[in-house]
Regions:
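Structural core segment of the AMP-binding/adenylate-forming
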Residues: 1-28
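Conserved pre-ATP/AMP-binding loop-to-beta segment of ANL
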Residues: 20-37, 44, 67-73
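Conserved AMP-binding A3 loop
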Residues: 32-60, 311
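Conserved AMP-binding/adenylation subdomain of ANL enzymes
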Residues: 56-73, 83-122, 207
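Gly/Ser/Thr-rich phosphate-binding loop
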Residues: 120-125, 134-198, 211
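AMP-binding/adenylate-forming catalytic core of the ANL superfamily
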Residues: 123, 235, 240-241, 262-307
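Conserved ATP/PPi-binding loop(s) of AMP-dependent carboxylate-activating enzymes
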Residues: 205-209, 220-252, 288-290
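Positively charged, low-complexity/disordered segments
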Residues: 308-310, 314-315
């Protein structure tokens, strides 16, 4: 790893290096507990300002809807600087569970030996994680201790989502798709496992002790089902705001427990939410509104069926 020689290296651990910069201490707001990086919807890097109480609230919410107990043994494959990876740790420590951590890659044999020997009971991944599992013939593996698979970090192709949902249904395991943002201390919604197949693609409902809603372009709350609007979230796990420069660390809570997610969604008759795309990610061609996110989803679905993929490549 390249190191700026202008700074003194204090220590190096697990690939991370702590440097002594000599910079003056930075004044911070008393409610600020920690910072996590995020790129947000625009891709511009910034830090999310968490306050004291965010993690505790999120831990309670997550452990409740997953039904976590001290007997759980989750296997952590996501980095701790990533909000969902961190949520795996704090939600399980909240109930006194053991978190299994390894630096082995999912493609290494040692990873699976560790998983079996340590009797891992759950696995949390992003769509890419499950694409790897699919290529590794995960469905043929004998993993009797594994009872829960959870997914977040983006929308999975429908066919892959269904494949894991059906596998879990047929093998006495639970498949729970979740939705969240760094700004909401990770998980903000989840799809109950009984809906994993019938409502595949939905993010489900708000986590316990929180609330989802939809608003129109005027900011009015949408009550009717199957009507698109911007999805909003209210809960104690909502963070304070962003930090783009040192001075921002002095800022107070700019959200007060409420945030507009920037996602365009609708709610069905059962109260389950479906995300259509990001606000603003639309083109207007010949008077018709075309969602870029929906186009990406269609292409992803096509690429998961060989015949359709051949047709797509031939276009």
């Amino acid at each position: 790893m390249a190191v700026d020689l202008h700074y003194e290296m204090v220590c190096e651990y697990y690939g991370y290096i702590l440097l002594r910069t000599g910079m003056e201490d930075c004044a911070m707001h008393p409610d600020l507990s920690h910072l996590l990086p995020t790129s947000g919807s625009t891709g511009s890097p910034k830090l999310v300002r968490h306050k004291y109480g965010n993690i505790e609230a999120a831990a309670l919410n997550i452990s409740t809807f997953f039904g976590l107990t001290s007997n759980d043994r989750p296997l952590l494959v996501l980095p701790l600087y990533y909000t969902m990876g961190l949520s795996v740790v704090f939600s399980h420590l909240y109930v006194g569970a053991t978190v299994l951590i390894t630096n082995q890659s999912m493609t290494d044999k040692a990873f699976w030996i560790f998983m079996k020997e340590q009797h891992a009971t759950s696995f949390t991944g992003v769509p890419y994680s499950f694409e790897i599992l699919n290529l590794m013939r995960f469905f043929r593996m004998d993993l009797p201790d594994l009872t829960l698979l959870t997914q977040g970090g983006g929308k999975m192709p429908r066919q892959l989502n269904l494949k894991f949902a059906e596998y879990c249904r047929d093998n006495g395991k639970r498949w729970i798709a979740t939705y969240g943002q760094s700004e909401g201390t990770a998980r903000m919604a989840y799809l109950p496992p009984e809906y994993a197949i019938s409502k595949c693609g939905s993010i489900g409902r708000a986590v316990p002790n929180a609330e989802l809603s939809l608003i129109d372009s005027d900011g009015s709350v949408i009550e009717l089902p199957n009507t698109e609007g911007e999805m909003c979230y209210r809960g104690k796990n909502v963070t304070m705001g962003y930090a783009r420069k040192r001075e921002d660390l002095l800022l107070g809570d700019e959200r007060n427990g409420f945030m507009r997610t920037g996602d365009l969604a609708y709610r069905d008759e059962d109260g389950c939410y479906f995300i259509v795309g990001r606000m603003g990610r639309f083109l207007k061609l010949y008077g018709m509104r075309i969602g870029l996110d929906e186009c990406e989803q269609i292409i992803n679905c096509l690429l998961y069926t060989s015949d359709a993929a051949d047709d797509l490549i031939g276009v």
